[in-house]
Design a protein with these regions (language model features):
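Flexible "arm" and connector segments at domain edges
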Residues: 1-52, 56-95
Length: 95
């Protein structure tokens, strides 16, 4: 599935509810999901992937509310090369 397809899927399923909730509260839900992901990762729990999926879905919901096309933004930021060194694979020194 392409990024745009996933964004459209989330829009179809959740946009009405997201609009009623508003962007501020939806963003807070995103932060809550990031917290759940952090806890699961730190504890070595087996549902880290599920928490990542939740974070992605809530991030997409926020993008939909803000009118942001994530596929366009991702390709602008990461044009098939590292945005810092312009190489693929990245040749930046480790940070």
């Amino acid at each position: 599935m392409e990024i745009r397809e996933f964004q459209n899927l989330i829009r179809q399923i959740y946009m009405d509810r997201d609009q009623k909730r508003g962007s501020d509260k939806t963003f807070l839900w995103l932060l809550e999901e990031v917290g759940e992901l952090t806890r699961a990762y730190r504890r070595g729990e087996d549902h880290v992937g599920e928490e990542m999926a939740d974070v992605l879905a809530w991030m997409v919901s926020v993008a939909n509310l803000l009118g942001i096309d994530l596929e366009t933004e991702v390709l602008k930021k990461y044009p098939r090369v590292c945005p810092l060194c312009s190489s693929s694979p990245c040749t930046c020194p480790f940070r």
